[in-house]
């Protein structure tokens, strides 16, 4: 019981087709395979799952998409999940905000920015199609604005959520990758628009689930950040990245980057490379990027 918490609001429940639930019989203490399909929970943002659901997979069961599947149960009229709250930030909490309000705002922005391809992508694909929290925040003019920029990647992560290599056993990714490269003008226009609405603490984040590695478009990022800062643009400019290009990180820091979140599954090179399968960079480059960022006052965090 101490591993469970009430399922947080804005969480999601998944049915796991072709997989039969496994449970513990409280009378015998033995595990039993049920005839019903298994279920799982995706905990709301700011929560970390602590246990996976247990099930038996039937022959011919479909491949599950790359989501986070948490162990969930039901008792006393409500759902419980194995998870812990790890962040008090409310930027991805939409309690009390109707989906209709978000959609109306997104459609208005689509009308107002007909020539900005990146804005069209974020509103149509990310907000209206996927319900991305960062994209919804941009539509509402609060907190964080996502800035996807890259069609390509220099890693071949086993669990990539935007594009799997040909022949992969993972037949479907949760998101579709960006299909064009935006211009600095398109990026900066979104930054200025967001800063004009979220006037207190605007955040701009390169490196989203619907793109490749943003550092493969380093000149675009550097130019966009420089233009925004030189025009007096304020706020936090963040980069979610594999941090594979130390020189680009250094130039971004000089241009006005505020924070860097480094994707890292292990501090052991052999384990890192086994998952990320880097192309054209090494684990040593990642370490050097962190050094370059910290030496220039950039806040560095690790995305495990």
What are these language model-derived features?
Residues 1-59:
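Short Lys/Arg-enriched alpha/beta "domain-start" segment
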Residues 62, 67-147, 164-174, 181, ...:
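N-terminal [4Fe-4S]-dependent radical SAM core
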Residues 23-29, 93-114, 141-150, 201-217, ...:
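Short N-terminal secondary-structure initiator segments
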Residues 148-166:
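Local cysteine-cluster metal-coordination motifs and their immediate loop/turn environment
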């Amino acid at each position: 019981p101490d591993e469970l918490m009430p399922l947080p609001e804005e969480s999601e429940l998944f049915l796991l087709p072709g997989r039969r639930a496994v449970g513990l019989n409280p009378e015998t203490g033995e595990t039993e395979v049920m005839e019903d399909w298994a279920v799982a929970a995706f905990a709301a943002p700011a929560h970390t799952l602590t246990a996976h659901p247990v099930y038996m997979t039937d022959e011919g069961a479909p491949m599950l998409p790359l989501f986070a599947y948490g162990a969930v149960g039901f008792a006393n009229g409500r759902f419980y999940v194995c998870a812990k709250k790890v962040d008090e930030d409310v930027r991805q909490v939409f309690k009390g905000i109707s989906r209709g309000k978000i959609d109306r705002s997104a459609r208005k922005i689509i009308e107002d920015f007909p020539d900005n391809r990146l804005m069209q992508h974020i509103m149509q694909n990310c907000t209206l199609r996927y319900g991305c929290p960062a994209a919804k925040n941009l539509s509402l003019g609060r907190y964080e604005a996502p800035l996807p920029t890259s069609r390509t990647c220099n890693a071949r992560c086993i669990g990539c959520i935007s594009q799997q290599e040909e022949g992969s056993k993972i037949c479907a990714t949760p998101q579709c990758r960006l299909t064009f490269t935006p211009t600095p003008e398109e990026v900066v226009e979104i930054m200025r628009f967001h800063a004009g609405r979220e006037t207190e603490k605007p955040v701009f984040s390169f490196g989203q689930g619907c793109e490749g590695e943003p550092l493969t478009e380093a000149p675009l990022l550097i130019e966009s950040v420089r233009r925004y800062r030189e025009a007096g643009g304020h706020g936090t400019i963040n980069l979610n990245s594999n941090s594979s290009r130390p020189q680009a990180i250094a130039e971004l820091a000089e241009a006005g980057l505020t924070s860097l979140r480094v994707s890292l599954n292990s501090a052991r090179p052999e384990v890192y490379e086994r998952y990320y399968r880097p192309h054209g960079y090494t684990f040593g480059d990642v370490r050097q990027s962190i050094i370059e960022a910290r030496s220039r006052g950039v806040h560095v965090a690790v995305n495990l």
